[in-house]
Amino acid sequence: MEIELSNNAVSWFKEELELPEGDKVLQFFVRYGGEFQLKQGFSPAFSVDKKEDVEIGYENHYDGLDVVIAEKDLWYFEDHNLFIDVNDGIDEISYATK
């Protein structure tokens, strides 16, 4: 399992979510529904949370941006390499598998 962010995605998260900021992390989690689905019926989502509030199961760092997945959400991301980029046409985050 690997989460890879493009340089454009790192810049987008930093600008749109005002990260890095103190002890805050970019957390990816699983939600019900959505367009891009690694497992049927569920899709990835993200939020900004305090690092101390997340039971971290996965962590990576991109140019000062701390990216985490909680232990409880690993089931969704396991066995997948997720590539996160920006769809420039609509200025939104896009997901793909590698």
Swiss-Prot record:
Domain of life, per lineage: Bacteria
Family as reported in the entry's similarity comment: Belongs to the HesB/IscA family.
Protein name: Uncharacterized protein SSP1406
Species for this entry: Staphylococcus saprophyticus subsp. saprophyticus (strain ATCC 15305 / DSM 20229 / NCIMB 8711 / NCTC 7292 / S-41)
